[in-house]
């Protein structure tokens, strides 16, 4: 058995971590075993990030991303499990479409993975729930990339079906009736934020929680971008996630980002961003997930009403959070909880998310003092850009998936990622 010696855990304790193949055998002091890594009480060791919200674009949009490129980017960013969303081509609204996507993931992903099922008027719940779905969603309450927005009746039906199958429903919560159509006369980059209002999110969260509760479904709100949305989710007993772009960017950044800062839901005012970050720090936000949604530079360079929505983020999420922890803005315990422990608990991943005996050895080693600027040219996504250009992050020195080194600080290694639901 191999030992990581004198690792600093998220809570500051210095412990040995002994690995037995793919699993953690023990966490303690003075553990016997072959020395694997001497952390020397300098390196922090965290459980690998579970990114419950990525768009790896395959099948259908491989020029933007593939399972190979997206999972390499994940590994280099300390992400050991990814969950792909349904809006590919074909969308994963049938069992056959899930099988097709899962085959790509099984062949090419170097991290563990899950596939979500989607809901449209053409969905086939019988075949869909016959597959090993990670969750149902994101279910779109307003149109986004892929035109998968659904009406209230179909959402209610989807919640009832998911409840009967004991599958979590993840929700893209925006109410199109609350969009400000007056903003459509504008052509500046901020027009998108003005159009898709904060009120649209809060109203949709309240509606989603109400319908989900009536149906007996477990509701998780995706990419919550406003403090009001977080509060509405909590009030209704739902869990929620926030993204790095909503935590670290605001409408103030749109002068520099232009259409590269268009996403759904959009960037909010800086006071709202600060209030969202406060909810991250104090525990009201359950999960950080990236909504990694890459597009090419050429695609994003269109005008604000034609540019596709979405930004990459799977490689920079954990580094940005670790940078915030290094600056004292966030505790390492919160980083651990929102990136690993909580996603594992919310989605029932019994082998993931915790550094404990019997869990998968999904681990990230970081030197907390090794902060550096983020540059798109250094990242591994096919899209080759980042909205966080020039921001400071702390990147992993090593990433392990089930005990195998998939990132050594310089190179991504081959590895057969597995479906976490099988």
UniProtKB/Swiss-Prot annotation:
Substrate binds at residues 55-57, 87, 295. The keyword Cell inner membrane does not apply. Its EC number is 3.5.2.3. The active site is at 291. It holds the Pfam family Amidohydro_1. SUPFAM superfamilies: Composite domain of metallo-dependent hydrolases, Metallo-dependent hydrolases. Gene3D superfamilies: Metal-dependent hydrolases (3.20.20.140), Urease, subunit C, domain 1 (2.30.40.10). GO terms for biological process: 'de novo' UMP biosynthetic process; purine nucleobase catabolic process. Pathway: Pyrimidine metabolism; UMP biosynthesis via de novo pathway; (S)-dihydroorotate from bicarbonate: step 3/3. Its cofactor is Zn(2+). Binds 2 Zn(2+) ions per subunit. One of its GO terms (cellular component) is cytoplasm. GO terms for molecular function: allantoinase activity; dihydroorotase activity; zinc ion binding. Zn(2+) 2 binds at residues 138, 172, 223. It catalyses: (S)-dihydroorotate + H2O = N-carbamoyl-L-aspartate + H(+). It is an enzyme of class 3 (hydrolase). Keywords: Hydrolase, Metal-binding, Pyrimidine biosynthesis, Zinc. The keyword Zinc applies. Zn(2+) 1 binds at residues 53, 55, 138, 291. Belongs to the metallo-dependent hydrolases superfamily. DHOase family. Class I DHOase subfamily. Catalyzes the reversible cyclization of carbamoyl aspartate to dihydroorotate. This is Dihydroorotase. It comes from Halobacterium salinarum (strain ATCC 700922 / JCM 11081 / NRC-1). The lineage of its organism: Archaea, Methanobacteriati, Methanobacteriota, Stenosarchaea group, Halobacteria.
